[in-house]
Structures are given as C-alpha cells and as structure tokens.
C-alpha cells in the first residue's frame, strides 16, 4: 500500500513539473507587459488647492482649449499654433454628454508642471485664472442698462463720484448711481468706447456697466431734480454716463514688480523667476494687473498707472500710494474706474504719453490666455474699430448721439492692437517653451462676444 502511494505522489510531481514547463513556454511567447502611465488630473480641471478626499474638482469658469497631446519624450505633438487657434464656439461652454461623466483624460503633465503659475512660458495657468474674482457679469450689465434707462432721478448730491462736475444720483427705487458729466463730449464718448472695448476684449468683469442718458430738465427722468441741475451747471441736452455706485471700494497700490523708485520697470516674466516666491493671492492680483496694463495701453489711458510713472520725476514714493482711478471691490476684483481719458482724449495726446505707456506694456511678458486670443484675433481681422462700433451700437440706444470713433482714431486703435499682438509673439518667442512655434488663428467664426 505504501509503495502504491509513493508511486502516485511521484506521478503527480511529474505532472506538476510538466505543467510548470508548459506555462513558462507560453509566457515566453507573450509580448512583454506594458506598464500603463500613472493617471494624472486633466489640466483644465486642476483645482487651486489640493482636493480633500472624495471632493470633486471644480468646473472651469471659462471654456478652455483641449488638453495638449504629448509624445513619449514629454514633448507636445501640438504646436503653439493649436494653442491659440480659436475653435468654433470657443466662448461657449462645451456640451457634456452622458457618456463623458466618468471619462478621465490625463493631460500628460506632471503635478509640479500643472501647479506652476505660468504655462507655455507666457500664459497664466488655468488653475490660477480660476481664482480671479468674478467682478461684473453680463447679466449684471444687461440688468443695469434696463434699470438706468427707466429710472427717475430723485436726488443729485456732490461727492463720491470723482470730479467735482459729477454727481451721485439716487433713483426712485433707492438705487444710487454715479452720473459723469464731461467737461467736453469726448470724455463721455471715451468712457463709453472704453467700456465696450473692455467687453470686446473679455475684460468687462473689471469695468462697471454703463448706460448713457440725456439731460433734459423737464424730462421724466430728471423732472424732480431741476434745481440740482441748475446748481450743477449742466448744459441742457448733454449726454452723461450712468454707472452703479459701488460701495466698500478700497484703494489699490501698485504691486511689487512695478514698484520702482528709480523709474525703471522690472519686466514681469516667468523665465527670470520673479514669480517663484509670490503667494497665490499676489499671483491672482498680478493676473488682473496684466489685463489692466494691456487695456490702458490699447485705450492710451494716461490717468491711471501712467500718471504715477510721470510723477516719479518729483515724487519717488508715488508707487507706494494709491493708484488713481483703480479700486478693489469687496470680492477682491480690481475695478477700472473713470475711463474717460481713454480712446478719444487719450488718442489725441498719445504722442505725449506713449513714452510711459509703451515701456509699461513691454514690462509685461505674462498674459491671460483668453485676453491674448482676442487681441490676436482682432490683429488678424484688421477690423477692430468696426467690431467695437457694432457692439456699441447694438447695446446702447443713444450711440448716435455721441460722435463715432474718427477714422484716424480707428486706425490708431488697430495699430495699437497690432503692436500688442507683436509684443505677445515676441514674448512667446523669447520665453516660451518652444520658441520656433508659430501662432495662427482661424477666421472670425465662433467668437461669441459681439
């Protein structure tokens, strides 16, 4: 009996040995195991802070270009050409399908790369842009136009709205508004054009919604403040601007990169490491400041940061004090106030102030990607003034009551956009990751902001 059991055990051992050899042979014929890359969060859903366990990533505030495709060596298979190409409907939220709910598309970028303040060498990161306060929305702008046009003014008070000729108005429903009366009509024209240029560039979150009104002492809107109108010495029939009065605004001091006592600006760029040690709040502030500098260059506004630069010649500490016509709202958004020096009056005296405006612009080599796209599109279209006036006339019924942008000023607006576009390309060539890449834009389809 024992002999039979030993024989059975030996036979079983031989079978196991044969099976092991067969499995080894099969394993040698299979292709080597392919390691899947570690899953990474998509770049366009990067949260500003590490997400707590189980917390979903916030949706991006603006539609973003699709993630870049990366090859095995870590290089992009798409060039900067694709990065700044405007896809159809680029400003509309992407449609979500049921099949996409659980889909995860890794961006191919490592975590340290995605958490940088700048991507592509010259663009603020998308995660950082998500932290910029919302400011004024399109819905607020539309609501204000409706309120201001139908409002009855019941009081006009001095103070609280800038220049002494302006007034703080109170409407019958209790709403307060700043009424700006220009020393000459071109100031109100410049204020209105600057507002609609901000909308054309996607910067309306920083500029208070504006409506125009005609001063008519016996008209329904002004009949209850006839005495105040006489005291203000406003000319009958003048066009004024109405913007909602904003409470709880605070002063704003120029951030460190431009706080120079020797009159020399420090270029703001990522390559030199100027952004390395800044806090997230400081970086969010810089995102807004770079938009402001681009906006003031395009409008030739000399009554904000440029006036500080001019004053450095006799006041070396001016950059450490509040900036004119710039405030911060309770939510943290910068508010670009009193833009009446822009476009019209600013263009008339541009030759005097561009020695400050151009170096200020050239001190910036990091941009909001959305703003850069629109600048480059307007540069390519060569019809910026036509688009501006089309947008203006579509939303403002009193548009015909103020002079349009003159042809010389329309040409100057286009030249300034061209100069800005070339500056963006120069920064990309100098500081971008792929200096040889080109930038092209499609036609005018899919802009969605006129």
UniProtKB/Swiss-Prot annotation:
| Source domain of life | Eukaryota
> Lineage of the native species?
Eukaryota, Metazoa, Chordata, Craniata, Vertebrata
Miscellaneous comment text of the record: Knockout mice for this gene exhibited an increase in dendrite extension and branching of pyramidal neurons in the CA1 region of the hippocampus.
Keywords attached to this Swiss-Prot or TrEMBL record, sorted alphabetically, are:
Glycoprotein, Secreted, Signal
Tell me the gene name. Answer: Fjx1
Q: Which residues are glycosylated?
A: 248, 277
What family, per the record?
Answer: Belongs to the FJX1/FJ family.
Expression across tissues: Expressed in brain, kidney and lung. In the telencephalon, expressed in the piriform cortex, hippocampus and olfactory bulb. In the diencephalon, expressed in the dorsal thalamus. Expressed in Purkinje cells of the cerebellum and in numerous medullary nuclei.
Signal peptide, first to last residue = 1-28
GO BP of this protein: retina layer formation
**Is Signal found in the keyword set?**
yes
| Entry-linked InterPro entries | FJX1/FJ (IPR024868)
Organism whose genome encodes this protein: Mus musculus
Biased-composition ranges for Basic and acidic residues?
Answer: 93-111
Write out the GO cellular component annotations: extracellular space
Which named protein is this?
Four-jointed box protein 1
